[in-house]
A protein has these predicted regions:
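Non-catalytic terminal segments and appended small domains
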Residues: 1-160
């Protein structure tokens, strides 16, 4: 994990102060614009501003992405993130460990300074009870981080 940049902390602080729902709706629309002059400029400005390189990506040409969202969630080459030999602790994402600690009475401090209930996050009270007394970790994905989430190869995704 990399250390948190000052810009990351400022970005997180701004997210707490701004009308996030409205901001999210606006960004959702902007990231799906397919008009080539706009999306190509948007991608190039973003790449330059955050120092993003595409040498690890399967698609290495910025203009080849259908929209900004396709660029932002780009796939990496299989060799880009080799797994460590067992036994090892692996992160499911690129990012910075921002918070960690014990689950206290089903509650945990989670994303962007908001307190969340484990049952709400898992959408199941019985599943949440299994984690009582356990620990949590929050990994912050900065704009320059790879934005796909991975799970262990031996895992089984049984719900969304």
């Amino acid at each position: 994990m990399s250390t948190a940049r000052a810009g990351d902390r400022l970005f997180t602080l701004l997210q707490q102060c701004l009308p996030t729902r409205l901001l999210s709706l606006g960004m959702y629309g902007l990231t799906r614009v397919r008009w080539k002059p706009f999306k190509n400029l948007f991608i190039r400005v973003f790449m330059k501003g955050f120092g993003i390189r595409l040498d690890e990506a399967i698609e290495t040409k910025p203009e080849a992405f259908v929209d900004f969202n396709a660029f932002f969630t780009r796939a990496l080459q299989p060799s880009a993130r080799p797994l460590a030999a067992a036994p090892a602790l692996l992160s499911p994402v690129d990012g910075t460990l921002s918070q960690f600690g014990p689950l206290q009475a089903g509650r945990l401090l989670q994303a962007k300074g908001h307190d969340y209930d484990a049952a709400s996050l898992l959408a199941d009270t019985a599943d949440a009870a299994r984690f009582t007394g356990g620990d949590f970790a929050t990994i912050y994905l900065a704009p320059y981080n790879y934005h796909r989430i991975h799970m262990p190869l031996s895992g089984r995704l049984s719900g969304w």
